[in-house]
Curated annotation (Swiss-Prot):
Biased composition, class Basic and acidic residues, residue ranges: 70-80, 89-114, 122-162, 183-199, 261-274, 327-341
Stored Pfam families: HABP4_PAI-RBP1, IHABP4_N
Family as reported in the entry's similarity comment: Belongs to the SERBP1-HABP4 family.
Protein name: SERPINE1 mRNA-binding protein 1
Low complexity biased stretches: 51-68
Localization per Swiss-Prot or TrEMBL: Cytoplasm; Nucleus; Cytoplasm, Perinuclear region
Modified residues (Phosphothreonine): 226
Segments of this protein annotated with the region Disordered: 34-227, 242-289, 327-407
Organism: Rattus norvegicus (Rat)
Keyword DNA repair: no
Cleavable signal peptide: none
InterPro entries hit by this protein: HABP4/SERBP1-like (IPR039764), HABP4_PAIRBP1-bd (IPR006861), IHABP4_N (IPR032381)
Function per UniProt: Ribosome-binding protein that promotes ribosome hibernation, a process during which ribosomes are stabilized in an inactive state and preserved from proteasomal degradation. Acts via its association with EEF2/eEF2 factor, sequestering EEF2/eEF2 at the A-site of the ribosome and promoting ribosome stabilization and storage in an inactive state. May also play a role in the regulation of mRNA stability: binds to the 3'-most 134 nt of the SERPINE1/PAI1 mRNA, a region which confers cyclic nucleotide regulation of message decay. Seems to play a role in PML-nuclear bodies formation.
Amino acid sequence: MPGHLQEGFGCVVTNRFDQLFDDESDPFEVLKAAENKKKEAGGGGVGGPGAKSAAQAAAQTNSNAAGKQLRKESQKDRKNPLPPSVGVADKKEETQPPVALKKEGIRRVGRRPDQQLQGDGKIIDRRPERRPPRERRFEKPLEEKGEGGEFSVDRPIIERPIRGRGGLGRGRGGRGRGMGRGDGFDSRGKREFDRHSGSDRSSFSHYSGLKHEDKRGGSGSHNWGTVKDELTESPKYIQKQISYNCSDLEQSNVTEETPEGEEHPVADTENKENEVEEVKEEGPKEMTLDEWKAIQNKDRAKVEFNIRKPNEGADGQWKKGFVLHKSKSEEAHAEDSVMDHHFRKPANDITSQLEINFGDLGRPGRGGRGGRGGRGRGGRPNRGSRTDKSSASAPDVDDPEAFPALA
């Protein structure tokens, strides 16, 4: 019973309208099959209310099992009804003693959806009968997309890859998320496209009709013109070659057709003259040194100098000129003026009143910093006494008697 409850619960969740015109089989044919079974059972001479009730119960179970099986299969192909030939074949097979595939049917849909088990456990390969609805699914995209989208529909059914258990990725117990099934369909009816947007590569290039083409639209990066440009350029090149070849052939034919004594010698003389001129031009030019110098002098620009003799054409205004010599007195006066300029002092100069000591310029801060009495190093301020000694011995700069050698 839990299996029945789970199945009923699953039908309600997946499709609430599951029981509205979901059976593809004709109920009248199911009833006819049940009546035939009744007749066969009653033909043996067994007739009674018990036999009739048993036959009715068997017919109901058969119809319920067939309805459930068709519900599971029709959820994928509801929009694409089967052709009449396929429907008749399915109905004939359904009249055989069916088996209600509850749990095993759910499990085996992922393994081999193209195979089913009969009551004796034999595997029936119904793949060629289920193919037509899938081919009809491809017909609409082909008509809508036109030339742009092409899918491989013309390939026969036998050449398609076998969708075995686990296959390339999506089957039960397979290798995880692989390349999906070969024909681009999942076990749940979901389709996996071979090519995604923005990619030129297709996973099944030898199956699909998509062809990889370079970006040659003439715009954007990595575009080198269009295919039409090559088609338009190539005939010109071929025509030029053909025209050149034709002209060569015509010349050869003319030379062959002309007799030996008429125009042939004229052409030979012209060819000889051209050959002689070419040979002369190709040879190196030889000349003597004098000829080469003459050519160089012609090309060289001549420089003209205004050469004249001494006192020739001299200007008369410069005749009275004489040379000036510097006197020694002027040089001494210039030296005195320079010294006065450096040592002359204004009346309000106070530099003589300032005390300038040149004692210890190398270490000026040692004496003043000598306190540090708090740390017990108070003996260092005595170094400041050097400045007093140096100040006492320093000469007075303004006193001329302190520098007798300069007097």
